[in-house]
C-alpha cells in the first residue's frame, strides 16, 4: 500500500504572517516529524493562491485580509517547512478545497492501493475541505488527519473540525 502525506497550506501567511497564530507556529515540529516519515515522492503540498485582486473576490469580501497573494513572501511555503518538502509536488489552489489535488489522488488510486494522511493549516478550513473531498471521491480508502500537526483559526474551531471529520469516518490520529 502506498501511503501519501498531504501537507496543506503550510505557508508564511498562515504560520506567522497576515493570518498567523501561535498555534500554527507551534505545530511546525509536528509537521516536520510527519514529513520525515515519508519519501518525497509520497508527499504532496498545497498552497492557497490568490490574485492581486483578492479583496474583490467573494472570499476577500468575507475574509478581508489580503493573504497568500501569488508571488509574495506570504504565499511561499514557510521557511521552516520548505527545505523538508523541496522537490515534492506542490499544487496551487484558488480556494479552500482543491479539486486538482483530489483528481490527482484519484488518479494515483487507480494504479495502486493508497492511504492518505493530512497535516497543516487550517484544520477548520482547508484541511477539513480537502479531507472531505478525498473521502467523498474515494470512500473506501483510509483518510487520516494528524491532530497535533494541524491548527485551526482558533483552538475551538480546530476541535470542531476534528469532530466533524471523525463523524465522517476520517481517522483522527
Functional labels for PLM-detected ranges:
Residues 1-90, 110-111, 153, 159-166:
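Active-site acidic carboxylates
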Residues 32-36, 128-138:
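Histidine-anchored nucleotide/phosphate-binding helix
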Residues 91-92, 171-173:
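Short acidic-hydrophobic, aromatic-tinged amphipathic segments that line or gate anion-handling sites
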Residues 39-41, 139-142:
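A short helix->loop->beta-strand "cap" motif at the edges of active sites that frequently abuts
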Residues 46-49, 94, 121, 148-149:
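Active-site-proximal beta-strand/loop segments in catalytic clefts of secreted hydrolases
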Residues 101-112:
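Short amphipathic alpha-helix with an adjacent loop that forms part of the alpha/beta core around
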Residues 117-122, 141-155, 173:
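A short glycine-rich beta-strand->turn/loop micro-motif centered on a GG-aromatic cluster
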Residues 92-103:
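Glycine-rich oxoanion-binding loops at beta->alpha junctions
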Amino acid at each position: 500500500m502506498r501511503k501519501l502525506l498531504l501537507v496543506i497550506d503550510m505557508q508564511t501567511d498562515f504560520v506567522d504572517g497576515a493570518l498567523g497564530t501561535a498555534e500554527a507556529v507551534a505545530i511546525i515540529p509536528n509537521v516536520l516529524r510527519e514529513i520525515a516519515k515519508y519519501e518525497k515522492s509520497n508527499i504532496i503540498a498545497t498552497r492557497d493562491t490568490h490574485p492581486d485582486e483578492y479583496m474583490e473576490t467573494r472570499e476577500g469580501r468575507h475574509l478581508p485580509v489580503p493573504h497568500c497573494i501569488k508571488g509574495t513572501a506570504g504565499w511561499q511555503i514557510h521557511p521552516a517547512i520548505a527545505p523538508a518538502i523541496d522537490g515534492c509536488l506542490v499544487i496551487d489552489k484558488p480556494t479552500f478545497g482543491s479539486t486538482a489535488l483530489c483528481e490527482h489522488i484519484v488518479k494515483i488510486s487507480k494504479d495502486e492501493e493508497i492511504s492518505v494522511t493530512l497535516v497543516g493549516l487550517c484544520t477548520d478550513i482547508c484541511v477539513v475541505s480537502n479531507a472531505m473531498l478525498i473521502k467523498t471521491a474515494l470512500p473506501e480508502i483510509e483518510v487520516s488527519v494528524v491532530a497535533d500537526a494541524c491548527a485551526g483559526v482558533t483552538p475551538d474551531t480546530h476541535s470542531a473540525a476534528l469532530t466533524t471529520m471523525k463523524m465522517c469516518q476520517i481517522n483522527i490520529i
